[in-house]
Amino acid sequence: MAQSQKNVTEDFLQSFADAFNAHDTKAIMSHMTDDCVFEASAGPDVNGEKFTGQEQVKKAFENVFATFPDAHWSNPRHFILGNRGFSEWIFTGTKLDGTKLEVTGCDLFTFKNGKIAIKNSYRKNRLPAK
């Protein structure tokens, strides 16, 4: 087993997903490397908005929870191949103005030393539900 994959299992990714559903940024960040990168599904660049390092990434996740106070990722499925992996999910959330969102998406991961080094998010672009 490669050193970069050590301790990364489907259970590890489920624990990461559980931390997101609990909106527990401390637990979320414990799954990520100190030099982690989060590439959001939207943003000004071709790869979405990029956040680097524990502080920036944590703030980005906190912003998701502030934007969608009831954010939830359901029906997760996790896959690992070497130092890469991905999770599929259905995201639901309601903005403060009442706009509801329900979309499928996935996260592509790169692992390093048993943690998530890169979380690259993708999701469908669906019109808001009325």
Regions found by a protein language model. Name each.
Residues G82-F91:
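A short hydrophobic beta-strand element
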Residues V37, T99, K115-A117:
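Residue-level signal for well-ordered, solvent-exposed loop/turn and beta-edge residues enriched
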Residues Q3-K6, E10-D35:
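Short acidic-aromatic low-complexity motifs
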Residues K6, A27-R77:
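A solvent-exposed, acidic/Ser-Thr-rich amphipathic alpha-helical stretch
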Residues T104-L127:
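Short beta-strand edge/turn micro-motifs at domain boundaries
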Residues H72-W73, E88, L101-D107:
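Short, surface-exposed coil-to-beta transition loops
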Residues G93-E102:
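Short, cysteine-centered beta-strand-loop-beta hairpins and adjacent loop/turn segments enriched
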Residues M32, F91-G93, R123:
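Short beta-strand segments enriched in hydrophobic/aromatic residues
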